[in-house]
Amino acid sequence: MNYIYELPMKVRDYECDLQGIVNNANYQHYLEHTRHEFLLSAGVSFAGLHEQGVDPVVARINMAFKTPLRSGDEFVSKLYMKKEGIKYVFYQDIFRASDGKVCLKGIVETVCVVNGRLSDSELFRSEERRV
């Protein structure tokens, strides 16, 4: 996969459950944070978009858990994106930094709501050309 963005992160204690591994819900936070940081790297603020009446929202998400992360683990969240009709599809994978093992493979489908209405968006056109 030709990733277009990477974000290193580290697991915090409170993200782990009783089994000592990252709770599954926190992976969705990691993916969302990566998308927001990707936007910022492209010069776009998620909050700024909302103020302009543009709200990218998740329509569907699929996460396949491969190798658990534990407290203190460093990892890299990687992203690839493509446009399919009015959707932007983000292929997001998380890798443990210490050994490169795949921890999660995710596919996140997003759409844009513009002034309260589902709409096609040119939001990532410049980024899409890079892929």
Residue ranges and their predicted role:
Residues R60-A64:
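Short alpha-helix capping/helix-loop boundary micro-motifs
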Residues M1-V58, V113-R130:
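Hot-dog-fold acyl-thioester-processing enzymes
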